[in-house]
Amino acid sequence: MTQFASPVLHSLLDTDAYKLHMQQAVFHHYYDVHVAAEFRCRGDDLLGIYADAIREQVQAMQHLRLQDDEYQWLSALPFFKADYLNWLREFRFNPEQVTVSNDNGKLDIRLSGPWREVILWEVPLLAVISEMVHRYRSPQADVAQALDTLENKLVDFSALTAGLDMSRFHLMDFGTRRRFSREVQETIVKRLHQESWFVGTSNYDLARRLSLTPMGTQAHEWFQAHQQISPDLANSQRAALAAWLEEYPDQLGIALTDCITMDAFLRDFGVEFASRYQGLRHDSGDPVEWGEKAIAHYEKLGIDPQSKTLVFSDNLDLRKAVELYRHFSSRVQLSFGIGTRLTCDIPQVKPLNIVIKLVECNGKPVAKLSDSPGKTICHDKAFVRALRKAFDLPHIKKAS
């Protein structure tokens, strides 16, 4: 293990932008809320043997802090407030909030503590897990192989898009959490930066160092936590949407739709929300069906879909993104976030399908009932039933 003991992470900003966006909102609105989150491997990988190495990395994370140049850079962005950034300057990861164990070969990780602190663990911890596992499993793989794979795919992409008007095609890097390594992600992003259709990255550290636009708004946990923050479960999604607009009335206005299925979301997404939010993000279910529902919803509300943006980010690769672009580009603005298929795309390397999801808020259960049943997460069957009833979802498949 000592050969891999060097810290994977070197910057507090080596995380997804929406984590800081949500953290500021939590800091201002829900300072005393406590949460718990758990790690899941959606594949059949037995990762428990890496528990000691991961625990070592968790301990090392307590030494990360916001540097002065990072603080100055964040201060220049239009949506961060001084009180939050001054607090973030003093923030340190607390390893006592994380338990890591080997449960008969299964990697068991649980996070708990104040939401304002726990919220920052997910993305860097997943990136650590991914990089540590790949260091052990694929020591022969390197950056050059990742770059070669990308170059070949860009040749195919050029052939696929020949003669196609690509002026409305916008691609973002969403690859931090399941990257092969920090070095691979940086190399891939630098190469993509040479393409006119590449518009930014979700990684704040890379955005700062490479002068890119940071991309991201909110994640499932924002909606999940409101299931216990809101006094009325049936109103929890609307409460989450409203609270976000309080924090960011004119910015970061892409709403995630699948915490409790797209249909349930659209019932809550009335004309005021639809007018004020800049667009929607797809993260599960059939993307064409989802996009058609979104466009139809805007039209029903009397809103021109051309004034809104649909962001696709579920298991995309370049070919899928082009297919969706061909289908929708004449009717709505589009952006595509690609993660694993860019930052962990190396021959003979199997990417990890890993997540960390909220399971409790203030000691009570929360759930994610997405448009892909395999992505559903909740321990408490009674709460899932209550959630289905509150959102009129009698036929949704059982939580796993």
UniProtKB/Swiss-Prot annotation:
InterPro entries: N/Namide_PRibTrfase (IPR041525), NAPRTase_N (IPR040727), Nic_PRibTrfase (IPR006406), Nic_PRibTrfase-Fam (IPR007229), Nicotinate_pribotase-like_C (IPR036068). Its EC number is 6.3.4.21. It comes from the Bacteria. One of its GO terms (molecular function) is nicotinate phosphoribosyltransferase activity. It catalyses: nicotinate + 5-phospho-alpha-D-ribose 1-diphosphate + ATP + H2O = nicotinate beta-D-ribonucleotide + ADP + phosphate + diphosphate. Signal peptide: none annotated. Pfam families: NAPRTase, NAPRTase_N. It is an enzyme of class 6 (ligase). One of its GO terms (biological process) is NAD biosynthetic process via the salvage pathway. GO terms for cellular component: cytosol. The modification Phosphohistidine is found at residue 220. Keywords: Ligase, Phosphoprotein, Pyridine nucleotide biosynthesis. The keyword Ligase applies. Belongs to the NAPRTase family. Catalyzes the synthesis of beta-nicotinate D-ribonucleotide from nicotinate and 5-phospho-D-ribose 1-phosphate at the expense of ATP. HAMAP family: NAPRTase. This is Nicotinate phosphoribosyltransferase. It comes from Escherichia coli O127:H6 (strain E2348/69 / EPEC). The lineage of its organism: Bacteria, Pseudomonadati, Pseudomonadota, Gammaproteobacteria, Enterobacterales.
